[in-house]
């Protein structure tokens, strides 16, 4: 099982990191921090300048997931980022990824939660320093999902202008 968890952590963690690097540094054709700020403003966030580096760094924390280091923290940040992405961009476009729906984001949301619930595996930093037994399990998975939903709801409700105002 540890080999499967290692593979899953590394692949999904690097996918998250790549998206964060696009937003933060403009790598791989990404918008960079200025473009991320502009995008956040276009979709109705009130403080896009403050949120842009937070959004980019939250996705770049996929490196923590890939390494299996501070796994619940990485899962919380990544899951919250995906809930915000679903709520602010993808939900209204339907389920299927082909139409920019939330299908892909839902998968990305579920993997860090599942890894927290099962533990990062034998080949992880958390295991190497003896934290994995204390920072994983079903209760941790539920706690991370709950906190991610609450945090994302705060961002979507408090930090985002009403939709009518954003499109006016």
Cite the ranges covered by each PLM segment.
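Helix-loop interface residues and adjacent transmembrane-helix termini in multi-pass membrane transporters
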Residues: 44, 68-70
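Extended, low-polarity transmembrane helix blocks
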Residues: 1-27, 49, 71-168
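Membrane-interface interhelical connector segments
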Residues: 26-51
């Amino acid at each position: 099982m540890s080999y499967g968890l290692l593979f899953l952590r590394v692949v999904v963690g690097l996918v998250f990191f790549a998206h964060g690097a696009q937003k933060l540094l403009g790598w791989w054709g990404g918008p960079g921090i200025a473009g991320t700020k502009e995008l956040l403003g276009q979709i109705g966030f009130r403080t896009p300048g403050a949120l842009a580096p937070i959004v980019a760094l939250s996705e770049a924390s996929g490196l923590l997931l890939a390494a299996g280091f501070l796994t619940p923290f990485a899962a919380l940040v990544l899951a919250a980022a995906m809930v915000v992405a679903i709520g602010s961009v993808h939900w209204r476009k339907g389920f299927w990824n082909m139409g920019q729906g939330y299908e892909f984001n839902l998968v990305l949301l579920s993997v860090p939660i599942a890894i927290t619930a099962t533990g990062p595996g034998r080949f992880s930093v958390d295991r190497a320093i003896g934290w994995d037994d204390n920072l994983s399990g079903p209760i941790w998975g539920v706690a991370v999902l709950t906190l991610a939903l609450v945090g994302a709801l705060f961002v979507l409700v408090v930090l985002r202008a009403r939709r009518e105002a954003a499109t006016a």
